[in-house]
Structure formats: C-alpha cells, structure tokens
C-alpha cells in the first residue's frame, strides 16, 4: 500500500510541477524545479523515502523514453549526420573515459584508476531530454539540436558499456584488452540494434494479424505499442546485447517500417496522445527521482568523507567543479578538432562541424548536460567486491556524479540563454514554403483521384447516382482542392485566406459545442448523442489548431 501511495504522490507532484513553474515570479526550467521538489520531499521534514533500484530504473523508465526519442528522430537527418553523431557518441566517449578517467585518478585522492574510469564512463552520456527542458523546444538551432539528439540516443549505450567493462575489471571478472573490448562493444551494439529491428518487425506482423482476426481494436494495439520498448529492451538484455540500443532501434523502425502508416486512424490518434502523456509523466518521474536521492547521497557521502583520512569535505565540492570543467574542455576541444579535421581533410564532403562558428561550438559544448542515465549508472556500481571488501571509493563516485549532473544543469541554465541570444534558430518561412508545396502537390493528386472516381461512378449503373448531383458534389470538392493547389503561386494571399477560413471554422465549431451542451441540459438529446457529436467536433478542432501551429 505504501508503494501505491508513493506512486500517486509522485504522479501528482509531476503533474503540478509544470503549474508551479509557470506561476513562479522568476523562470525556472522544469527539470530543475522537479529536482528541487524531489529534494524537498526527501528532506527529513517531509520524509518521503523512495528506494532507488538502478536496475529497475533502467528497465522501467529508460526504454519507453528512448523509444519515444527514436520514434520522433527524423531518420533522414540522423543518417545524413551519421559521421557527426558517431564521432560524438563513440569517439568522444572513448576520449572522455580515458582522458577524464586519468584526470580523476591524478587529482582526486583515494580513487584508484579503474574506479576513476568507471566514473568517467557514467559521466560520458549526455541527456537531450534535460537539455530540451532547460532551454525549451526550438531554442537551439536545428542543425545543432539534431546532432545533439542523435548523440544522446547513441552515447547512452557506449557510456554504459564502458562502465560495464570498468566494473568487470574492478571486480576481477574480466581482463581488459583493447581488441577484446572493441569486439565486445561491436557485438553488444550491433546485436542491440538488430534485436530492436526484429522485435519491431514482429510487432508490425502481430498488428496485421490482430487486424485480420480481431478487427481494428485501438486499445489492444496501443497496449502492445506501449509494451514494445520493454520487450525490445528485455529481450536484448537477455541475449547479452544492448537493451538501450534495442529500444532506440525499435522506435526508429516504427517510423520507417510503415507500421503507423498502415495502422487504423483511431489507433494513430490515440497512440500519439497516449505517448505524449506518458513522456510527460516518465520524464517528470526521472527528475523527481533524481531529486529524491540527493539528500541521501549528500548525507552518506559527507559521513563517509569525515572518516576517510584521504578526503577533505571541501575537496568533494571543488572536485565537482574541476571534473565538470574538464568535461567541457574535452568536449569543446573535440568539437574544435572535428571542425578543423573536416575543413582540412574532408573538403569534398565536409562534416556539419566544418561550418560551425566558435559560438555554435560553445553552444554544443554547454548543451552536453548530464542526466538520468548518469545517475542510474553510478548507482548501479556494486557495494562490495567478490572478496567481500567495499568497492573502492564508491561514495565518492556517487557524490561526484550527482554533483556533476546538477552543476551541468545549472551552468546550462545560465550559459545557454546567453549564447543563444539573437541567434538564428530556424527558417520558418522555408518550412512554411515546403508545407505549402507539399499541400499543393497532394491537392493535385487528389483532384485526379476524384475525377477518376467521378467517371467510375457515372459509368456504374448499379450506383444509381444522379449525374447532376455527382457533378455538383465533385465540383465542390475539387474547387476546395484547386484553391489549395493554386495557393503556392500567391503565398501571401493564400496564407491570409487559410487563416481567415480557420478562424471562421473554429468560431463555428465552438458555437456548435456550446449548443450541444445546451441541448443536453434541456434534455433534447441524450448524453450518448452528446459524446458522439462532441468527439466529431474535437477531431475537427484538433485538426484546425494543429494546422495553425
């Protein structure tokens, strides 16, 4: 019962956190607000204690969030920026683990080399969800954000695999060699991607089977879609490959396989709204859980530091700043090196980095905030070695990782708005132009289809449709489509006409809705009739509002 009440409290806090953020006299990013609320609830005054199980956390929260990110990731842009993404998600992770690992070993007393590599490994993954939370959607230029999102999708796996190697060496269950580690990583990565593809393909086949035998029942199909990331993750982990990459691959496969395109309309509409709600709750839970762990981490670490002769308490805090500064320096240096390398050796087909200014490199550097994967990874480090001794400096690893997470978020909140001032984010006029061209092209195809259908119906004696009525209806529909097709030639007039028509339609829909409630209040229609007609109006209004965004 206690677990049930804890889940209810956390869900309530997540739902109210957005409201609290908006009514605050000063602006606080939602992730920081949720972390602060979590820390406040875990303080002894309130005493909300939630036991953090890293393995359960990785299974419960990470697969659906990464699946959703993979689902939303534009596959074309991801493939176009493949060199940039893998340069950050693989090469930079290796550089970070080695470089920062040696730095921690040299400057932080009491942390041996292998645990230092473990800490560097958990600090290597970046968090695109936290980044969007602290700067807002659409604030970072698209050419930068696309690469950062792809990096965050991939470096979770490379960072956790590096952590796995470091812990295995520290536990004495593995002898590290560069060749062995490379082969193991390739096996884990490629196997995870293949597992995600296969599970997603099986999901598509099962949907077609269910539609054939059980009808288009959206509830069943959405539940199966919700289970898909968990199935991908668990199956991949069971066979010894990357569950994280499997969840990402499953999400990206959904967009390319045509599963959603062939799905029934009701399923697509409900799936989108359901996933939007789940993303909000799960993202909020992640940051709330991070906040709930902070008081315990702080108390445990300070108590352990007091009895550790090699550590001064003030050194723990200065080491956080030092490690974060080193992470930023390595990241900036790597991006700068990639820029110079691209301009020098890849002149025929340069990487995106080649066109970045120093300011854009700084944005990408400070955008490398740390988040949930880092916390889950460091807390998954075992308490004891196989011989029963305590894992070396574990409390320092946990404290430093948590500190770097918070410090990276705070620095991002301060620096990114400054760097993003007066920067060109996206060419909205170009996007509107593309949308108008696409709508005009589809309208022309639709006109041809209607003309063919009109000819077929006129020739079909079994339809028994009056020719005058057939011509009148088809002409009306074709006329609406023709205006859309001609709109690309007079863009300004077309935009004004569309906006005016949308305003008229919205006004009409809202008056219809008010009248339906009046008819139900006067008992002229039943509640069932009201709900059916309201559903139709809601779909039309959602379409009109979506077009305006």
From Swiss-Prot:
Subcellular localization(s) per the UniProt record: Cell inner membrane
Entry GO MF terms: potassium:proton antiporter activity; sodium:proton antiporter activity
GO biological process: potassium ion transmembrane transport; regulation of intracellular pH; sodium ion import across plasma membrane
Any one cellular-component term (Gene Ontology): plasma membrane
Membrane-spanning ranges: 1-21, 28-48, 50-70, 85-105, 106-126, 165-185, 187-207, 222-242, 278-298, 310-330, 361-381, 398-418
Primary site of residence: membrane
Membrane topology value: Multi-pass membrane protein
NCBIfam families: a_cpa1 (TIGR00831)
Family (UniProt): Belongs to the monovalent cation:proton antiporter 1 (CPA1) transporter (TC 2.A.36) family.
Annotated protein name in UniProt: Uncharacterized Na(+)/H(+) exchanger YjcE
